Amino acid sequence: NPEAVMLFYDSEFGSPLQYFASVGIDPTRVLHIPVQNLEELKFDLLKQLQACERGDKVFVYVDSIGNLASLKEVQDATDEKSVSDLSRAKFLKGFYRIITPYLRIKDIPMVQIGHIYMTMETY
C-alpha cells in the first residue's frame, strides 16, 4: 500500500533505506527504529501499537527477532558469566501475548525474521 507506514525494527543494520526503494517501497514511509535487545523491542512496539487506530495503514517489520539478546543475556556477558539464558523463551511467549491482541484488533500485519535452524551441520 503506497499510503502505509512501515515500522522497521532493526537489530542487524543490514538493510539501508535505499534497499526499500529498490523493491518499490518509498523510504520516506519507513520509520527506522534500531533496537539492541528484546526489551527495547517490546517497550517501543507496544507504545507504537497503542498509539495506532484501527484503519491506520501500518506494517511492522522486525529484522531480526532471532538475533536479539535479552537484557539478562547482555548483563551475563558484561559480568563475564558463561550461562544459558533460559528466560528468553518465556520472554518471547509474553511478548507475543502482549502484542498479538493489538495487531489483530487494529488489523496491523507484522513480519519477523527468526533465524531458527533445526540443525547446524551446514554452518
Segments from the language model and where they lie:
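Conserved inter-motif catalytic segment of the P-loop NTP-binding fold
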Residues: 2-94, 98
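Phosphate-binding/switch region of NTP-binding enzymes
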Residues: 85-123
